[in-house]
Amino acid sequence: MNGTLVYEDYISLYNRKKIKSLSFKKSQIQPSSIDLSLSEECYEIKTSFLSPDNKVRDKLRKIYSKKISLKTPKIFKKNKTYIVRLNETLNLSNSITGHCNPKSSTGRLNIFCRTILDYCDEYEKIPNNYKGEMFLEITTRSFDIKISKGDKLNQMRLRKKINYYLNDRDLKKINKKTPLIFTDKKNIIENGLRVSVDLSNNDEVCAYVAKKTSLKINFSKINFYEIKKFWKPLMPKNNCLIIEKNKFYILKSKEKICIPSNLAGEMIPYDTGIGDFRAHYAGFFDPGFGDPEGSYAVLEVKTNELPFILEDGQTIARIKYEKLNKKTSVVYGSNINSNYQNQKLALSKHFK
């Protein structure tokens, strides 16, 4: 069937060598996506690029400034850009397309990453029936990050033939039967599901802003770092918060959201109609997220041009929903060690 591939499909693709990797682990497969892992092959570059007319490797040879091995962990310095070959290669067929996104933990550390493929004129895009290597461009923007071979910074979602994104009419019908969002607001569905920011309590922490620090974070260390060394907690003033230029914030949604087990979701990362800021790095929501009682969406926010005032209940992002190609036997949650089920205002899994 057409639609977004599920857990069982990724198992099949790997078994049939449509996804190849010498270091593949079954734990990389999520309900409607697959985590991609870093190889040891890494390059420092001074300019970003796409490779619409060449292989990425051929273009890299001409522009890289330094070759690095990730056999041993290396420090990726803030605001420097690196290209790492991913362990996974693709040999797709049967009209399969897709795209990639940073994982939640990557976005919450303000690590900007995007996938580059051979003969492809768009970042993050998996062209129809793609065959070839995959590379990841990585720029860490708030902290120096220790990166190792095998780390998983991004994820891939594949589809059979076309996207089956649901229109507003379909979403409203589903929302009446099985809530997609828990709120008393009206007009919550408009060009997707509208998600607003929670600045309702002036006496509680509503956000974190990344501190300037020389301390380093090892991407492999989980539940390890003290929050106060890297983040400053913020409280709203008069139910408002000023987003300062070039600073990085973690906030949460006012509403709880739900991704039913027969659907997948994706946050739209930048919407000029909502405001001049990036409202989310990590896009994918797997089936079962927040099911059945809802879970808050955590939002990564940054503005590049001017300071921006956010008010309580202001729309900050949109979620679009898409149909799965079949019912999945695995959903997001504790059974597959999902890190952010039932989350509140949550930093990345690296902090305790």
Give residue ranges: language-model regions.
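DUTPase catalytic domain/fold
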Residues: 1-352
